[in-house]
Regions:
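Short, structured coil segments at secondary-structure junctions
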Residues: 271, 763-764
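A short, glycine- and acidic-residue-rich donor-binding loop in the catalytic cores
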Residues: 758-762, 778
């Protein structure tokens, strides 16, 4: 079977029982890939949320069905999503390879027949960060000894190797790995594994007798002389791959990045291997990044650069001269050349061909791309009180005087100016805003003089002193609004504007996703949202899942009381009493879920053998519950699980449907289990090997995580996800956020954490951007968290086909908070310019339709320009087929090539 036939077979399969099926656009992409991949590598640049991963799984399966092997390089946080998609697509894969120790553990079994070497796996998931090893110095020798051991054994294979000392398992695993790799490579001296080992030995142990100092630990450090050779040695143990899939291929573009080292040194390619890069943003900040992305798949970029640059120049000119015939003709010629130059390597489906976007265009009478609407949350400096107006003006003044002061003052002044609009700079100056300015200034001047005296040769000049005094004056003015010291960020105009916009969305029953960069303002936003919602619920007699008020929350509650204009003074003791009474009512409601909890879950399992991992954990849960039959939610596993299920499922459990109870328990298990012991893959007989799994210990870990998650002090209306948020907590937050009627209603995510790898689209279509970004690709990724297949927006379009007014057609909304009169207004303007360039190259939107609304006389020219934009969409299928949405019941009869059943599982 060749690749085209295998891909066709995968595309034509009926829906699997779990609903895994390619839609029409994905099937067209798969056929186009099957035609082009034998000739060269490919970039799959589908827009965010259109199912690139599923296409890649289908391609991987087709390659495996043809007898090939596949390496899949993914960001560290996406292993779970990839494993899930591979499992649904019936592609067997070990756990995500993250470390050298995990690499060696493939040879941990004492019985050689039960070992699972990486080179025997048909598909291997590898973390982008796999090659970021900490080596050299005092690090353990086993971390780098693979290279000298492999070279010695390959040079003299008959010599063998001695067993390691008893109990030295690292070196024993290393010895087994070396023996296994050499044995496998020896089967075919012309194969890639043998060729790489021969080259390594030739480089490290040349015939003239020289040695490369293979036992010098320092040479294996990052940048060390032997580091690349060790990377190639490790790659030999992974075996040769016929297809290398690179997820998020726009990441780590530098030559020295971990991903680049994986591609250049670690991953061993077969002679006919191809690379397939997945990225929604092959170009981010400038058109030259096309060349970097193309280089990732081994494309020849020499002739492409000029074509890309000419297209970028033509786009800029035609935007400035829309009515100029020559500019339009030059643009159309450049667009055609751009498309022709990249078409052999690039496939991209965008929302122009999405049926929901097309339905929106018909309903709204607008271009399809208008389904996304930008709605600025404006902070108008002119409407602020005098203190804030002075603060904004003072921050801008710092741009003039800060550069005249010394480096320390200049840095402080610049930071305040650049971050005034989003609250970050204000947070860093809180201490200065809450003490006696005059007394503290004297102390600070004394400290500076004392610190400078030993090293300063010349006294400060009058100019330096005056510049510093001017900078200090403006800093004092900028921080004056916070002199009260009661949680200054809670009254920051940008945060208040965001709160009002967020609450307007939650009041209509939808959720809001917020992105920002700086932790302090994000935490202040979460605290304020929770405090306001808590007071609102108490006033309305609605349940609030919190029994005590903690000291850290009190400033936010005071601010919320003032902002909501609640009657009378705020007494903490009265508030805590109201919380306790409210919580008792909520606990009484939870009680009804606890009594029959175990029996209802067990009834839900009846006859279902599809998830033995979760079933074994349920049995462990039952044993733990029997040991602790009494107690509060803090101590009783039954009460804890009931609380968690109630929080995640809410009214779904009121029907007391055993299937709903069992499904809710499985969700808890999948979200809180360690991914290193996640649902174990089944072998051919349908049985899982759990002999070495301590399910009681595994359940205790889950119980601890549930305790941490559901016994938090805060109520949870809004939650914060930042860099230190644990993976299992992120999964729980994702699970709950995708449920329409449970907390959190607002998820506030730090940009670096939440913009990739999370699906947050099932109950949310609104994204608030609290802090400005410079990179439009980042904003695309952020909006893409809610703009995905199966989103709330799609369901609203489906339900609202007969909407009366075009302006009422549902849209996905992204809402930047723009503080007018501060530097972030400039930031947003620059971002918009870059975003327009990105859309011209990837989205087919060279000139915004908003311009046509303002200038109808330009409408036909704008349509002409946008219609000529490069389009890399694969051609549609020639025959109509039933919608993938309707086919959900067909059984899967996938077949793999013959394998030893013992090699089909690692988990």
């Amino acid at each position: 079977m060749d690749l085209a036939d295998a891909a066709q077979a995968t595309a034509d399969e009926p829906a699997r029982s779990a609903g895994w099926r390619l839609n029409d656009g994905q099937r067209a992409s798969l056929r186009a890939i099957a035609r082009r991949l034998p000739e060269n590598g490919l970039i799959i640049a589908d827009e965010v949320g259109m199912g690139k991963t599923r296409i890649a799984v289908a391609v991987a399966r087709a390659v495996i069905d043809c007898g090939g092997r596949v390496a899949i390089l993914v960001p560290p946080g996406l292993g779970y999503q990839w494993r899930s998609e591979l499992r649904d697509g019936k592609v067997q894969s070990p756990l995500l390879l993250r470390s050298l120790w995990q690499y060696l553990c493939a040879w941990q079994n004492d019985d050689p027949a039960l070992r699972e070497p990486w080179f025997d796996e048909r598909a291997v998931l590898i973390s982008h960060a796999f090659a970021n090893w900490s080596l050299g110095g005092n690090r353990q020798a086993w971390r780098w000894r693979l290279l000298p051991a492999l070279c010695a054994r390959w040079r003299e294979p008959r010599r063998g190797s001695q067993s390691s000392r008893r109990g030295d398992r690292e070196l024993e695993y290393l010895r087994r790995a070396v023996a296994g790799i050499v044995e496998a490579a020896s089967i075919d001296a012309d194969a890639p594994m043998a060729q790489r080992l021969t080259t390594l030995v030739g480089d490290m142990m040349p015939a003239d007798g020289r040695r490369m100092g293979l036992n010098d630990a320092a040479a294996y450090r990052s940048g060390g002389t032997l580091r690349p050779a060790l990377e190639r040695a490790v790659g030999a143990g992974l075996g040769a791959f016929d297809l290398v899939i690179i997820d998020e291929a726009h990441k780590s573009r530098g030559d020295d990045s971990g991903l680049s080292r994986l591609l250049d040194n670690v991953v061993l390619a077969s002679p006919s291997a191809r690379r397939m890069a997945l990225t929604a943003t092959p170009v981010e900040l400038d058109s030259g990044q096309w060349e970097q992305t193309l280089a990732r798949i081994g494309a020849d970029t020499k002739a492409v650069g000029n074509v890309i640059e000419r297209y970028s120049q033509a786009v800029r000119r035609v935007r400035q001269c829309i009515g100029n015939d020559d500019a339009r003709d030059a643009y159309k010629a450049a667009a055609s050349a751009f498309r022709d130059a990249l078409a052999r390597w690039v496939l991209r489906r965008d929302k122009r061909n999405d049926r929901y976007v097309q339905a929106f265009a018909r309903m709204a009478g607008e271009p399809g791309h208008a389904y996304r609407r930008e709605r600025e949350i404006v902070v108008d400096t002119g409407q602020l009180d005098d203190g804030w107006k002075q603060a904004v003006c003072a921050a801008e003044s710092l741009s003039f005087v800060g550069r005249q002061a010394d480096a320390d003052w200049s840095s402080k002044a610049t930071r305040l100016r650049l971050t005034m609009g989003n609250g970050h700079g204000i947070a860093t100056l809180m201490d200065q805003a809450t003490h006696d300015a005059e007394a503290d200034r004297k102390q600070e001047e004394h400290d500076q003089t004392a610190a400078a005296e030993p090293v300063r040769a010349d006294p400060p000049s009058d100019t330096d002193d005056k510049a510093r005094q001017r900078a200090q004056f403006w800093i004092d003015v900028a921080t004056r609004p916070f002199g009260g010291g009661q949680g200054p960020l809670y009254d920051h105009p940008a945060i208040l504007a965001a709160v009002n916009a967020i609450e307007a969305v939650t009041r209509r029953g939808e959720k809001v996703l917020v992105f920002g960069r700086f932790t302090r303002p994000l935490r202040a936003l979460v605290d304020l949202l929770n405090a306001r919602e808590m007071l609102t619920c108490l006033d309305a007699g609605k349940p609030w899942p919190q029994s005590k008020l903690h000291d850290r929350e009190w400033p936010a509650v005071q601010a919320a009381h003032r902002q909501l204009k609640r009657a009378g003074p705020l007494e903490r003791s009265e508030l805590e009493h109201a919380l306790e009474q409210n919580y008792r009512t909520l606990e009484s409601e939870r009680e009804k879920y606890r009594g029959d909890l175990l029996s209802l879950i067990e009834q839900g399992w009846a006859g279902d053998t599809s998830n033995p991992w979760a079933k074994n954990l349920f049995d462990a849960f039952g044993r733990a519950a029997d040991m602790q039959r009494v107690g509060s939610a803090d101590a009783n596993p039954r009460a804890l699980v009931a609380r968690a299920m109630h929080a995640l499922r809410g009214g779904d459990l009121e029907r007391r449907d055993p299937l709903a109870y069992a499904a809710a328990f499985v969700e808890l298990v999948e979200a809180t289990s360690d991914r290193d012991v996640e649902q174990v893959d089944m072998d051919a007989a349908g049985d899982a090997d759990f002999d070495d799994v301590d399910f009681d210990a595994a359940w205790k870990t889950i119980e601890d995580r549930l305790n941490e998650e559901f016994n938090r002090p805060e109520g949870g209306f809004a939650r914060l996800m930042h860099g230190d948020t644990k993976p299992e907590t992120r999964r729980m937050q994702q699970l709950a956020f995708n449920r329409a009627h449970v907390y959190p209603r607002v998820l506030v995510a730090q940009s670096m954490v939440g913009r990739e790898g999370l699906n947050l689209h099932r109950a949310c279509r609104t994204v608030v951007l609290l802090h400005p970004e410079w990179n439009p690709a980042v904003v695309e990724q952020q909006i893409g968290r809610v703009d995905r297949l199966g989103s709330l927006w799609e369901s609203l379009i489906e339900a609202g086909r007969h909407v009366e007014q075009p302006q009422d057609v549902p849209r996905i909304e992204f809402c930047p908070v723009v503080f007018k009169g501060t530097y972030d207004e400039v930031n947003w303007r620059v971002l918009h310019e870059r975003w327009e360039d990105l859309r011209a190259q990837l989205h087919g939107v060279v000139v915004s339709s908003n311009l046509a609304d303002r200038h109808p006389e330009l409408a036909s020219w704008i349509e002409e320009i946008n219609d000529a934009a490069p389009n890399f969409t694969p051609p549609p299928e020639s025959t109509a087929e039933p919608s993938g949405v309707m086919q959900r019941t067909a059984q899967n009869d996938d077949q793999f090539g013959a394998r030893d059943p013992g090699q089909e599982r690692r988990g």
